């Protein structure tokens, strides 16, 4: 996988202020504020910074937590995980493997088959609709 490196100025020119805050400074959007929280269309979710494919709509579920939730990533996603002890909590941060964008966090309270909940900021992803079948 090709790594993507840009300066802070380049990211600021490419992203809107909320996308930059969330993805480049490890911010968190307010619960229930993101455009994909209740989104149910068929397709894929990719990194808003570099278009790396991350999640399929078939793994999205309604968790009630206020952020888009997935029980698994695409087989090819290779999402990076690292410990996060900010804000007095112990969590696992999720990062795009191609550009190191902050995506959200992973928790062990999700549904089968994984038992995991990928809690993702809407500002860190964009949706690509599944093409209509002929």
Task: Locate predicted features.
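A short Gly-Trp-Pro
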Residues: 2-134
């Amino acid at each position: 996988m090709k790594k993507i490196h840009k300066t802070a100025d380049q990211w600021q020119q490419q992203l809107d202020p909320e996308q930059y805050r969330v993805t480049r400074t490890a911010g968190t959007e307010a619960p229930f504020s993101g455009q994909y929280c209740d989104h149910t269309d068929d397709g894929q979710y990719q990194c808003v910074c570099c278009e790396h494919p991350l999640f399929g709509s078939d793994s999205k579920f309604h968790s009630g937590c206020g952020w888009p939730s997935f029980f698994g990533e695409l087989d090819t996603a290779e999402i990076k995980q690292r410990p996060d002890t900010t804000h007095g909590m112990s969590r696992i941060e999720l990062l795009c493997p191609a550009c190191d964008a902050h995506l959200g966090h992973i928790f062990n309270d999700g549904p089968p088959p994984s038992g995991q909940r990928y809690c993702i900021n809407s500002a860190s992803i964009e949706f690509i609709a599944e093409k209509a079948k002929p």
